């Protein structure tokens, strides 16, 4: 196959002449000779040859259908209806263009408006932005927002120690520059927020955070009481939620949340190595809250002819206003992921959302029951997706055995929480088959 050089020799000579050089070597004469080496790349290939080589490489991958995974801990295998992918691949949606010109972007803007409306209905708070980067970035922005709401007079944000470790890292990165102290609350003997410890640490806090479910997969039984403790201390109540549970539990807004964050990509997106994602961010319909909300909102208005129209509004981002006055330095969002989530949620409807939550609860309960036959379940309670399991043997050995059996085991927890010993989180979703769980237990019996 012949080579085609870009730019070609004539163009190269013309450019060199324009800048006063006779050769490429003269242009880069300042580069030490030791750093100049042969451009050692293989010969070019035809499209068919590239196709065959890539196909051979890709054939080494194993999907979750060929190798069932119980990994969980934030990334889950959910079924995405085929029409979701078809719709978001339309050129109106699949574009790098930001819809600044509302007059030519009504389709995208309305889709994002529908996303906001659906999330508002699910989380029980009326004001939703058009998404953040992910759950972690939404949490970081929520913490900073609580400080702004207190006009910088409170510089403490209280979180459960058992918040997802990676989400905790993002939170600390976000808040370090703002000198915001992250205070961790212990868990009790049931793996839930220790209310007495919370009461001791909540004074002078800007905000208090809790998750539904928590990192151990447990539903916190005292969400409303945690919110009351926060409000009594003058702190704002921030709730992080996995939205796939919202068809079977009360909305966080109904439980007293001032701000709700979460992960929208559980709807409409594959696991895809953990990304891209879309962070949920919702708050109360109060001018004080709305003005401090990060990101941007898609609003509905009327055009010059009195027809319904959608526009980007309240864009308090550094791209549009002075950096010192901006509520966030996020200059974009995850629009395509948010649209995919909206299509998926709308396709499910209220009944589908309820059925989704019920099936996940049922599969998680079966997984927990079977795991309890071969290992210790440290915490009692209702689990959603994740189940914490403690083993007597080193978990890495157990995991290697599972891989040999073509099963991907749980998420190793000990590096983050040494006090939990040889523990791992095993997860189930609506896609988890009974025979997968049974095969997992059989494999565990062999190694334990």
From Swiss-Prot:
InterPro entries: GcvPA, GDC-P_N, GDC_P, PyrdxlP-dep_Trfase, PyrdxlP-dep_Trfase_major, PyrdxlP-dep_Trfase_small. Its EC number is 1.4.4.2. GO terms for molecular function: glycine dehydrogenase (decarboxylating) activity. It catalyses: N(6)-[(R)-lipoyl]-L-lysyl-[glycine-cleavage complex H protein] + glycine + H(+) = N(6)-[(R)-S(8)-aminomethyldihydrolipoyl]-L-lysyl-[glycine-cleavage complex H protein] + CO2. Keywords: Oxidoreductase. The keyword Translocase does not apply. Pfam families: GDC-P (PF02347). Belongs to the GcvP family. N-terminal subunit subfamily. The glycine cleavage system is composed of four proteins: P, T, L and H. In this organism, the P 'protein' is a heterodimer of two subunits. The glycine cleavage system catalyzes the degradation of glycine. The P protein binds the alpha-amino group of glycine through its pyridoxal phosphate cofactor; CO(2) is released and the remaining methylamine moiety is then transferred to the lipoamide cofactor of the H protein. PANTHER family: GLYCINE CLEAVAGE SYSTEM P-PROTEIN, GLYCINE DEHYDROGENASE (DECARBOXYLATING). This is Probable glycine dehydrogenase (decarboxylating) subunit 1. The lineage of its organism: Archaea, Methanobacteriati, Methanobacteriota, Thermococci, Thermococcales.
């Amino acid at each position: 196959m012949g080579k085609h050089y870009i730019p070609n020799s004539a163009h190269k000579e013309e450019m060199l002449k324009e800048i006063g050089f006779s050769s490429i070597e003269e242009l880069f004469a300042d580069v030490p000779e030791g750093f100049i080496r042969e451009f050692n790349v293989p010969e070019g290939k035809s499209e068919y040859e590239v196709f065959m080589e890539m196909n051979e490489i890709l054939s080494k991958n194993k999907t979750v259908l060929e190798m069932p995974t119980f990994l969980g801990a934030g990334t889950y295998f959910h079924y995405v209806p085929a029409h979701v992918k078809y719709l978001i691949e339309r050129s109106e949606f699949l574009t790098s263009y930001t819809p600044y010109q509302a007059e030519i972007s009504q389709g995208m803007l309305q889709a994002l408006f529908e996303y906001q409306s659906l999330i508002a209905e699910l989380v029980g708070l009326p004001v939703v932005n058009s998404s953040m980067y992910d759950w972690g970035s939404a949490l970081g922005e929520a913490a900073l927002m609580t400080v702004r709401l207190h006009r910088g007079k409170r510089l403490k944000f209280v979180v459960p120690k058992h918040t997802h470790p990676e989400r905790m890292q993002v939170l600390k990165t976000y808040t370090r520059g703002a000198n915001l102290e992250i205070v961790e609350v212990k868990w009790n003997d049931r793996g839930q927020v220790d209310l007495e410890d919370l009461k001791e640490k909540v004074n002078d806090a800007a905000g208090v955070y809790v998750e539904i479910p928590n990192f151990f997969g447990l539903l916190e039984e005292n969400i409303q009481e945690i919110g009351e403790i926060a409000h009594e201390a003058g702190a704002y109540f921030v709730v992080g939620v996995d939205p796939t549970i919202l068809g079977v539990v009360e909305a966080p807004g109904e439980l007293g949340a001032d701000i709700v964050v979460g992960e929208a990509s559980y709807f409409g997106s594959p696991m895809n190595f953990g990304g891209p994602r879309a962070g949920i961010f919702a708050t109360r319909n109060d001018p004080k809250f709305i003005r401090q909300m990060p990101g941007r909102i898609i609003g509905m208005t009327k055009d010059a002819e009195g027809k319904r129209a959608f526009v980007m509004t309240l864009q308090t981002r550094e791209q549009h206003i002075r950096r010192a006055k901006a509520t966030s330095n996020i200059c974009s969002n995850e629009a395509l992921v948010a649209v995919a989530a909206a299509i998926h949620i709308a396709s499910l409807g209220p009944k589908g959302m309820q059925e989704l939550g019920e099936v996940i609860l049922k599969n998680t309960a079966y997984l927990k029951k079977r795991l309890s036959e071969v290992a210790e379940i440290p915490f009692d309670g209702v689990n959603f997706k994740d189940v914490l399991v403690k083993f007597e043997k080193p978990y890495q050995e157990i995991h290697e055995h599972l891989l040999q059996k073509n099963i991907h085991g749980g998420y190793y927890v000990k590096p983050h929480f040494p006090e939990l010993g040889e523990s791992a989180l095993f997860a189930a979703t609506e896609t988890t088959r009974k025979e997968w769980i049974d095969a997992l237990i059989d494999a565990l019996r062999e190694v334990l």
